[in-house]
């Protein structure tokens, strides 16, 4: 009986910490980016809270659908930078970003929803139809499985072997970096910390450091 009570107390504490953390995030985004951004932040945190009980496939669908409503805009137009990786806070606050921002926000949301980092990767690829570089999120239900692709340019979550428009170049998650020779696992090339943009983003995310875009879209 004591063990059950202890577990219930732990669960209540976890819920309170989650609520407090979400409230802090919403308030900070609202203060920095305005009321419309605050409404997006509320919807974002509701997605995380309300999707905890879903299956992993349902979590993929909910996350992909939510973020694919945001506006695509290039880093050059938004930040006046050739390449800037926005945190989820910045992406939600602004309501727009490029393919990296869509992918990073989805990746971080899926981690919050309890999907193991070993099942997820951010994949840098060449879009053969658009003839430009692109980033997507992939999900491996099993280590040897063909991954599913979450893409801001395609609302359907398809297996990688059905995405002939994408040529994967390298992929990474929170710990590892892979060089991709085919649409599968790839070869480990070291730690993800080799990517300077990734290190900068993780530092800003950890400290909820927000930046204003140079241009309003």
Which residues are covered by each model-predicted region?
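N-terminal signal peptide c-region/cleavage motif recognized by signal peptidases
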Residues: 14-16
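A structural boundary/capping signal
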Residues: 18-217
């Amino acid at each position: 009986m004591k063990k059950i009570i202890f577990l219930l107390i732990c669960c209540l504490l976890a819920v309170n910490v989650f609520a407090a953390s979400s409230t802090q995030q919403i308030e900070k985004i609202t203060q920095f980016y305005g009321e419309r951004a605050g409404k997006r932040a509320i919807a974002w945190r509701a997605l995380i809270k309300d999707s905890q009980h879903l299956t992993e496939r349902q979590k993929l669908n909910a996350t992909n659908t939510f973020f694919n409503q945001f506006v695509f805009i290039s880093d050059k137009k938004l930040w006046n930078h050739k390449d800037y990786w926005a945190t989820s806070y910045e992406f939600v606050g602004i309501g727009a970003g490029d393919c990296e921002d869509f992918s990073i926000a989805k990746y971080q949301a899926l981690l919050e929803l309890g999907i193991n980092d070993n099942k997820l990767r951010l994949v840098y690829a060449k879009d053969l139809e658009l003839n430009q570089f692109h980033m997507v999120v992939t999900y491996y239900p099993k280590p040897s499985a063909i991954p599913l692709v979450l893409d801001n340019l395609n609302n359907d979550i398809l297996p990688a072997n059905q995405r002939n428009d994408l040529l994967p170049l390298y992929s990474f998650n929170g710990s590892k970096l892979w060089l991709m020779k085919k649409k599968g696992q790839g070869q480990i090339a070291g730690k993800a910390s080799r990517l300077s943009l990734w290190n900068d983003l993780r530092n800003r995310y950890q400290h909820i450091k927000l930046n204003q875009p140079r241009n309003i879209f």
